[in-house]
Amino acid sequence: MKKKTVSILLTAAMALSLAACGSSNSTDSSSKSSSKAESISASSASSEAESASSAKSTADGEVFDDTTVTVFAAKSLNSVMEMLISEYNKTQPNVKLVGSYDSSGTLMTQIEEGASCDVFFSAAAKQMDQLEGENLLVEGTRHNIVNNQVCVVTYEGSNTEVTGLEDLNKASSIALADGSVPVGKYTREALVNAGILEKADDVSAITTQQVSEALGGVEINECANVGAVTSAVAEGSNEVGTVYYSDTYGLEDRLKVLQVVPYDLTGNVIYPAAQVANKEADETEQAAAKDFVEFLTSDEAAAIFRNYYFDTEVE
């Protein structure tokens, strides 16, 4: 405002010295000086708007300086994460989010072995619980973000006789994730609760061979993560497979959902996220990592998750 006042007074003084029109209300009101004042005002307003835009803040009022945040996320989050990152960068353009996607068990092991990571977004609570027990997470940053459902799928155009878990033994081949992979663990849980597999203290320890035997010796393609299962079925390499419902997003013309497995067979398929205790991260990186985890709980993020077939009704 001070700059604006000085500019207007200077304009008025110049107008008087040139014997132009008289002043009004203590300022020069000639059309020429008014036009110039309006131009100055518009320029000032534009400058202030640009300044305000560059200072656009998050909920806690902070815009971060340039920093990079590494996110380890379950393979089933690959597609939705691209949209989440894009949305987050609308308010935090200086934060570069780098995603690394694999099975939650593999990512957990990498964190335990000292891999540089700022945020862990798991497809199951088990891996998050283990890291929390090892004090590898920042206290108070863990949140349950979304729920998902296991599906039995086949490729579009297949003549499979399989309708769901109950008759998986009719398949010529099955793509199935290893028990250490959340979707593989949930599938085994469902098969136990459906009476197809025998009960076990730790269902994730049930081997692929044991699953095959319980299904009458059907051929099983053991996959390292849910993405590999999705690809194997979509490409027709295996007749059926078990994936998450969210994994069918964008593949509606290639995958056919035979059964959405009910929660009473699998239990809730909760995806938790938390900030990792990364000793290599500076203060800005740590603050941005925490902020991104909080963003994942926002209404904006929830809308994106729902578009990708995730359930946002979680406790």
Name what the model sees in each region:
Residues 16-20:
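C-terminal motif of bacterial Sec signal peptides marking the signal peptidase cleavage site
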Residues 92-99:
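A generic structural motif
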